[in-house]
């Protein structure tokens, strides 16, 4: 009986001694810090204003992997100015709805190689939505500046 009591007290003492006595909050695990992606004219190989496809010098798959880590706005800096602001990077895997300008990575139409498109909303079935139409008008000036700049430096594909 005495041995059981001693064993119980040792077990209780060991359990209590191994508990942490500080109240510090556990820090969340994160990988790399999330940054907004910025593209410059040196990143863009060409842009097709008809289809709105943008071809980057970087490999599509590695660029797609990097962009998946971003959260929020993407910027196209041409010269010293931010010419075009994109609300989000989306892919064919995305089930969310966006009613503002997005950079869409399309892998369904060509499974061997994905393509990037600048679209006014995602998915495109919401193109006639009132909020999308308002944002199209709001972004018209950005689009004009973006296309004029790319024309000036010879990066428009027709």
What positions do the PLM features span?
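Positively charged n-region of N-terminal signal peptides that target proteins for export
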Residues: 1-5
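C-terminal motif of bacterial Sec signal peptides marking the signal peptidase cleavage site
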Residues: 16-18
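A structural signal for conserved, well-ordered secondary-structure elements
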Residues: 22-158
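Sec-dependent N-terminal signal peptides
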Residues: 6-14
């Amino acid at each position: 009986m005495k041995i059981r009591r001693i064993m119980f007290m040792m077990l209780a003492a060991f359990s209590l001694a191994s508990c942490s006595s500080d109240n510090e909050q556990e820090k969340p695990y994160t990988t790399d810090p999330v940054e907004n992606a910025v593209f410059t004219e040196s990143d863009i190989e060409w842009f097709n204003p008809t289809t709105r496809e943008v071809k980057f010098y970087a490999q599509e798959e590695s660029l797609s992997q990097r962009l998946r880590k971003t959260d929020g706005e993407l910027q196209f800096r041409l010269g010293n100015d931010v010419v075009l602001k994109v609300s989000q990077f989306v892919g064919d895997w995305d089930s969310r709805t966006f009613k503002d300008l997005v950079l869409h990575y399309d892998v369904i139409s060509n499974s061997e190689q994905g393509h990037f498109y600048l679209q006014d909303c995602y998915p495109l079935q919401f193109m006639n939505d009132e909020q999308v139409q308002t944002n199209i008008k709001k972004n018209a000036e950005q689009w004009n500046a973006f296309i004029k700049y790319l024309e000036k430096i010879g990066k428009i594909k027709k």
